[in-house]
């Protein structure tokens, strides 16, 4: 499912800090978009006098971003915190994909970067460029680094279908119930399009704070 950013568990997700590198450039662009004959100089004065322009820009971008959908993936399947937070306390499953087998579904993947401050978005630059989408969707607080996240962006927040061939593995959590494991494997084996899927299970290491992946 591709969810709207407003539904994410982190309220800081997709936030940014607006800056105006060139008031003249912004004023010129606004004047050109208007049906009335506004002079850029008058628009520039209005911008400088508007103390809420940053807040209004943030609200406008939020509205646009929340029309779209994002699906979040990870480059790792053995991270303890990921299993604790997103897999029903290690009772859930992790799906493994070969993205090359479904390029349409996994189009425009964004590798998330992690830092202390919001990304800066220049209000005076044209909106909607890939650079700004990547900055908004691909920047998170540095404490989330363990997620090693990759995001895929779609036009609408809704469910999308992936090609079955792209699903290559299912890994069960170390606390997954035996009946759940049996049911999932049974369903996959009964579907000719999923006969290639490999099954694994995490096991708690006996000496270190880590998970080992064991083939079933």
Regions found by a protein language model. Give the residues of each.
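Partner-binding and oligomerization surfaces adjacent to conserved cores of proteins
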Residues: 1-216
């Amino acid at each position: 499912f591709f969810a709207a950013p407003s539904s994410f568990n982190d309220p800081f997700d997709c936030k940014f800090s607006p800056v105006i590198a060139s008031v003249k450039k912004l004023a010129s662009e606004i004047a050109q978009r208007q049906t009335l004959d506004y002079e850029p100089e008058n628009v520039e004065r209005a911008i400088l006098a508007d103390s809420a322009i940053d807040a209004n820009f943030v609200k406008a971008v939020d509205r646009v971003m929340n029309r779209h959908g994002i699906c979040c993936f990870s480059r790792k399947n053995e991270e303890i915190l990921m299993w604790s937070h997103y897999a029903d306390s290690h009772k859930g499953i992790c799906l493994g994909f070969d993205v090359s087998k479904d390029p349409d579904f996994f189009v425009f993947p964004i590798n998330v970067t992690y830092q202390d401050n919001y990304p800066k978005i220049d209000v005076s630059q044209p909106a909607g460029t890939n650079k700004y989408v990547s900055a908004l969707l691909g920047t998170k607080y540095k404490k989330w680094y363990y997620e090693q996240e990759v995001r895929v962006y779609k036009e609408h927040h809704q469910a999308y279908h992936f090609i079955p061939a792209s699903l290559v593995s299912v890994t069960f959590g170390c606390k997954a119930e035996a009946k759940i494991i049996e049911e999932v494997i049974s369903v996959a084996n009964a579907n000719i399009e999923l006969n290639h899927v490999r099954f694994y299970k995490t096991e708690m290491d006996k000496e270190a704070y880590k998970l080992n992946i064991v083939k079933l």
